[in-house]
């Protein structure tokens, strides 16, 4: 960790495009990448691999503090790589089983505290792009550039629908919209680190913007701050 390394935080709700933007930006700048949303899945997956019960807060906290993980920004149009203990786990951590485990470990306060420390350890030269829901408000409140990326629930549901259909999955647009609205409510109303823009965040609505247009807006903010 290098506490002097610059950080650009990209927060926002599910389906806003923050993960895609963060990955492309990290690759473009040659900076480190943190996909904070994947950490709970990684912890649940790692715990299962090591035979640790998902209710054992003490052992989970130790695992969280020493997660050996690396995020590799992908080329345009491809998924980022997530390397855990030297193994590419990009696809296996996206299963429903791992997702359910992630929800269990995320409810444990000591685990959340340990992962907060672990997230801050990703800060290193030449810089870090941190993608999540509370990067600018909780994890890196001193970041020189904070972006809050959003889009209408309808547009986010449409994007998810096209993504899943492209994988051959049989999905309903209306059910996806219901899921996104329900998740938005949970994320914004939760007691710990609710989803909200930092007071000094640049807010971007990507509903009618392409990924390249969003990137161009962020590049402009980077140039104004002389960050890269």
From Swiss-Prot:
Keywords: ATP-binding, Cytoplasm, Kinase, Nucleotide-binding, Transferase. GO terms for biological process: nucleobase-containing small molecule interconversion; pyrimidine nucleotide metabolic process. CDD domains: CMPK (cd02020). ATP binds at residues 12-20. It is found in: Cytoplasm. InterPro entries: Cytidylate_kin (IPR003136), Cytidylate_kinase_dom (IPR011994), P-loop_NTPase (IPR027417). It catalyses: CMP + ATP = CDP + ADP; dCMP + ATP = dCDP + ADP. Its EC number is 2.7.4.25. One of its GO terms (molecular function) is ATP binding. Pfam families: Cytidylate_kin. It is an enzyme of class 2 (transferase). GO terms for cellular component: cytosol. Belongs to the cytidylate kinase family. Type 1 subfamily. NCBIfam families: cmk (TIGR00017). This is Cytidylate kinase. It comes from Pseudomonas putida (strain GB-1). The gene is cmk.
């Amino acid at each position: 960790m290098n506490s002097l390394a610059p950080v650009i935080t990209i927060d926002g709700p599910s389906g806003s495009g923050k993960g895609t933007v963060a990955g492309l930006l990290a690759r473009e700048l040659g900076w480190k990448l943190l996909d904070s949303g994947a950490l709970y899945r990684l912890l649940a997956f790692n715990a299962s691999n090591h035979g640790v019960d998902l209710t054992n807060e003490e052992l989970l906290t130790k695992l969280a503090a020493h997660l050996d993980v690396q995020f590799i920004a992908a080329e345009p149009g491809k998924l980022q790589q997530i390397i855990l203990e030297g193994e590419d786990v990009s696809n296996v951590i996206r299963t429903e089983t791992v997702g359910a485990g992630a929800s269990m470990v995320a409810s444990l306060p000591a685990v959340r505290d340990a992962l907060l420390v672990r997230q801050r350890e990703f800060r290193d030269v030449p810089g870090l792009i941190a993608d999540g829901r509370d990067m600018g408000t909780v994890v890196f409140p001193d970041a020189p550039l904070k972006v809050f990326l959003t889009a209408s629930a309808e547009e986010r549901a449409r994007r998810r629908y096209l993504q899943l259909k492209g994988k051959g999955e049989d999905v309903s647009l209306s059910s996806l919209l219901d899921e996104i609205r329900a998740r938005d409510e949970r994320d914004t109303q939760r007691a710990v680190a609710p989803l909200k823009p930092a007071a000094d965040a640049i807010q971007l609505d990507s509903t009618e913007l392409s990924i390249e247009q969003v990137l161009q807006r962020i590049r402009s903010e980077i140039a104004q701050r002389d960050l890269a």
